[in-house]
Amino acid sequence: MTGNVEHEPMRHRFVVRLPEGEGELVYRPTAAGALDLIHTGVDPQLRRRGIGEQLVRAALAYARAHHVRIIATCPFVARWLEKHPEERDLVAER
């Protein structure tokens, strides 16, 4: 079971809340206008349910819709992008 991803721009995160816990993807806006995706965390009882992927996809959809690039500082996001090269056009040059 997965939940709906909510964007909390004031807290710089995307979050999924379920009765058993929550997952979040935290970002930091950069001076260049990119989103630095810095941390993905999912409560242990929710792991292996695709919550992390759901969060990454939501962040990338947001970036695409708002014409901003991303930086994949978070190791989970970086590994996910390695497996999904079709999304790498969103990655900012460093």
List the predicted regions and their residue ranges.
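N-terminal first-folded block
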Residues: 1-34, 38-40
